[in-house]
C-alpha cells in the first residue's frame, strides 16, 4: 500500500494529459478538488482565521498593476511550458498547477486546449483559437470556444456517445463553478477592492495579451497565410526578452520542448526529450 508521500510523489511526476487518457472521470474529480480548495479558502476568510491581504484603495496600487499584469502573463507562459514538460520533474507538475491556479483556468484545462492548438493549428473548426483578420473577432471566438473544444477532446479520447455527452455537460457545469469559486477565493484573500481594481484587470489584460500574441504569430494582423511565424522586431523583440521568446512561435511549433525558443539549438533534457502534448513519445 503506497504511503501518502509516495502518492504525492507519483502525482507530481505524472503529466495531466496522461491522467486524462487513463480516467474518463479525471477532469471532474480534478475540478472538484479545486472547488473544495476554493470553498475552504472562503470559509477561512469568512470565519476570520485568515484576513484579506489588502484593505482600502491606496495610491501604490497604480504601481502594483503593471507588476500584477506581468505576473499574470508570465503565469500563462509557465503553464504553457509546463504543458510541454519543459521543467524538470517533479517541478513541472508543481509549476503548472501553481500558475494555473494563479490565472484560475487550471493546468489540466489549459493543457488539453493547447494539445488541440498544436494538432489542429489554424483549422477554423478544431483549433481552439484560430485567427481572423479582425482581432476582436479572434478574441471573442477564442473565449467562446474553450468548453466546446474541451468537449471535443473528450469525445476524441472516450467516444462521442449520449452517455459521454451527458458527462461532458456535467463537467462543463463543474468547470464553470470551479472557476467562479477560485476567483471568489482570490477576491476573499486579496480583499474586494484590490481584487476589482488590480487583480481582475490584470487577468483580463493577460488573457488579451495571450490572444493577441497568438494572433500576430499566426499572421492574423496580416489577414492571410495563417500559420505559425517568428516575430523578433520592434515591440516583439522586447516581448521576446520579457517573456522567454514568446513571439518565436514558428520555432515553438517546430521544437515545442524548448523553454526559450530564442535559443533554438538548445538540446532537450533527457527527461523532456518526449513532448507530452504532441505525443512524440509517451
Describe the predicted segments one by one:
Residues 54-55, 86, 220-221:
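Short, flexible segments with low predicted structural confidence
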Residues 86, 224, 258:
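Conserved protein kinase catalytic core
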Residues 89-90:
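Cytoplasmic-side transmembrane-helix entry/capping segments in multi-pass membrane proteins
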Residues 1-74, 78-83, 93, 97-200, ...:
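Non-catalytic, topology-defining segments of multipass membrane proteins
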Residues 221-224, 255, 272-273:
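Polar-ligand-bearing catalytic/cofactor-coordination segments
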Residues 201-245, 249:
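Alpha-helical transmembrane anchor segments
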Residues 250-257:
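Short, contiguous alpha-helical
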Residues 80, 114, 212, 218, ...:
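Divalent metal-coordination and catalytic microenvironments
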Amino acid at each position: 500500500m503506497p504511503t501518502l508521500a509516495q502518492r504525492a510523489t507519483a502525482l507530481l511526476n505524472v503529466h495531466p494529459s496522461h491522467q486524462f487518457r487513463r480516467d474518463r472521470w479525471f477532469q471532474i474529480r480534478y475540478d472538484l478538488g479545486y472547488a473544495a480548495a476554493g470553498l475552504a479558502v472562503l470559509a477561512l476568510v469568512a470565519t476570520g482565521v485568515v484576513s484579506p491581504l489588502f484593505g482600502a484603495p491606496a495610491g501604490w496600487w497604480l504601481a502594483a498593476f503593471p507588476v500584477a499584469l506581468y505576473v499574470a502573463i508570465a503565469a500563462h507562459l509557465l503553464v504553457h511550458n509546463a504543458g510541454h514538460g519543459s521543467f524538470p520533474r517533479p517541478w513541472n507538475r508543481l509549476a503548472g498547477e501553481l500558475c494555473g491556479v494563479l490565472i484560475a483556468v487550471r493546468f489540466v484545462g489549459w493543457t488539453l486546449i493547447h494539445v488541440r492548438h498544436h494538432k489542429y493549428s489554424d483549422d477554423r473548426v478544431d483549433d481552439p483559437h484560430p485567427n481572423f483578420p479582425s482581432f476582436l473577432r479572434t478574441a471573442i471566438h477564442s473565449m467562446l470556444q474553450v468548453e466546446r473544444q474541451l468537449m471535443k477532446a473528450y469525445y476524441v479520447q472516450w467516444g462521442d456517445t449520449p452517455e459521454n455527452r451527458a458527462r461532458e455537460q456535467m463537467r462543463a457545469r463543474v468547470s464553470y463553478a470551479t472557476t467562479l469559486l477560485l476567483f471568489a477565493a482570490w477576491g476573499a484573500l486579496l480583499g474586494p477592492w484590490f481584487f476589482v481594481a488590480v487583480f481582475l484587470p490584470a487577468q483580463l489584460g493577460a488573457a488579451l495579451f495571450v490572444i493577441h500574441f497568438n494572433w500576430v504569430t499566426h499572421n492574423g494582423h496580416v489577414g492571410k497565410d495563417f500559420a505559425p511565424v517568428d516575430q523578433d522586431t520592434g515591440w516583439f523583440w522586447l516581448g521576446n526578452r520579457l517573456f522567454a521568446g514568446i513571439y518565436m512561435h514558428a520555432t515553438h511549433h517546430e521544437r515545442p520542448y524548448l523553454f526559450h525558443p530564442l535559443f533554438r539549438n538548445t538540446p532537450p533534457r533527457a527527461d523532456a526529450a518526449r513532448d507530452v502534448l504532441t505525443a512524440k513519445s509517451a
